[in-house]
Amino acid sequence: MRWRRVGDVVAVALLLGAAAAAAAAAARHDYEEALRKSLLYFEAQRSGRLPHGQRVAWRDHSGLTDGLEQGVDLVGGYYDAGDHVKFGLPMAFTVTMLSWSLLEYGADVAAAGELAHALDAIKWGTDYFIKAHTKPHELWAEVGDGDTDHYCWQRPEDMTTSRQAYKVDRRRPGSDVAGETAAAMAAASIVFRQSNPHYSHLLLHHAQQLFEFADTYRGKYDSSIAEVKSYYASVSGYHDELLWAALWLHRATGRAAYLDYAVDNADEFGGTGWAITEFSWDVKYAGVQILAARLLMRGEHEERHRGTLERYREKAEHYVCACMGRNAAGGADANVERSPGGMLYVRQWNNMQYVTNAAFLLSAYSDYLAGAGDGDGDGGGGVATCVGGGGAGAGEVFAAAREQVDYVLGSNPRGMSYLVGYGERFPARVHHRAASIVPYKDSKEFIGCAQGFDDWFGRRGANPNVVVGAIVGGPDRRDRFRDDRENYMQTEACTYNTAPMVGMFAMLNRLSRQESPSTTTTTTATTSSPEMGLSVNR
């Protein structure tokens, strides 16, 4: 439905309706349970030697010789999804979003008793990035080979597939993967600034080196590493990652040079030009635009930056309004399609990544709008301006974010939770090698490449292991979902699907416990950003 200002009565009615819907949703879902389970998922995806405190007991050590042939230690990190390749670009994006999630809602994560687990999830990734960044101008961007890996169905503990490692360097650049890794380490450095200052400093050092590498030696990483093209091709190029990394480094350091970079290159790199309707591991423009708009609305800039930051904000609000279906001009592509049940729909394969990322961006932006509406910034007030007229206030933007979260948790036509392990109905046949085969600790009998397909992949029954906290690819544009291991487009889960939901679940847990329903749609702000002060508004 397109929004029009037709009077105060209608506006008040819309806000009251949004508040009522949000209050009803709060009563339906246990967000604290969702938070706990979402963090378990990252333990299921761990590669390397598992720690003594490992809670996902059906996993064991794996990938213990990664990097050995190349003479580097690349043990650790995360498997991206249901296979066993370690892809650097989506892994780094996962860590960036986990970190941003904590920077916005870390106080709520701490209040729920899950801060230590969230920090562990981030550090498991950043410890690996430190290993992978072996020289100032060298980054190991992939371990394993997607082609050989996808021909096998094995537990990671039994892997017989290639563990070839691939790097980017001065001769074979990869500005996108280096830029995203810089962003991840910069964002994580803020997260650890108070709790582990030495580690925070180390992360920031790597982030600055990686950004310099990405900017000086420019090129797409899939041109340097051909093996990644069929799996995580950098379709959007590397300009968005350079802007993204610069803004995260500005947030981490406060240095004007990084903001100057994002402003000076805004037009050439597409930051103020692209009107985007998706945000993902590949396409970062919406995130860039929202980070830049935050600076404007908080007044954290010099006067010479204002004009460019205003244009960033215009594009940020195009994305926000597109997710709400409120851009009244620009044609059919100006808004994101919705399923009959209300799910944002971008494309068939792993659509849930766009849903969860949109929910987080809308929620964060609603906080920024609320701050601007309170007069704390200089960005023109607390209403997002949509293309073709009309707008959306902070409460409405937040209600739209919450609607997507609740869809994931089961408020949908099928009544199915797409967060595995949550609710009465959730996917039982997740496309996930380790989850679909008897645990290694229960049966150490070797399972070969083809044997896994013969004995486990084609089984009709549920997986023997529940990969708790995974968010699967989800339903199609008509809300249809087929729970079948072979249906990888819908039943495979990825780390970057769950990452933005960690903070969202924590924040919604707090709001659902508050007595006044009006607070659930006006602001979600905490004081945990940017320095992880970890106080909670109650």
Swiss-Prot record:
Record-level Gene Ontology MF annotations: cellulase activity
One cellular component term from this protein's GO annotations in UniProt: extracellular region
Subcellular location field: Secreted
Location, primary (coarse class): secreted
EC number assigned by the record: 3.2.1.4
Pfam families linked to this entry: Glyco_hydro_9
Region (Disordered): 513-538
Compositionally biased intervals (Low complexity): 516-530
Record bears the keyword Cytoplasm: no
Swiss-Prot/TrEMBL keywords: Carbohydrate metabolism, Cell wall biogenesis/degradation, Cellulose degradation, Glycosidase, Hydrolase, Polysaccharide degradation, Secreted, Signal
Signal sequence, renumbered to the chain: 1-26
Active-site residues annotated for this sequence: 83, 431, 483, 492
Domain of life: Eukaryota
Reactions this protein catalyses: Endohydrolysis of (1->4)-beta-D-glucosidic linkages in cellulose, lichenin and cereal beta-D-glucans
Keyword Transcription included in the entry's annotation: no
GO biological process terms held by the UniProt record: cell wall organization; cellulose catabolic process
SUPFAM superfamilies: Six-hairpin glycosidases
Family stated for the protein in its record: Belongs to the glycosyl hydrolase 9 (cellulase E) family.
Protein known as: Endoglucanase 16
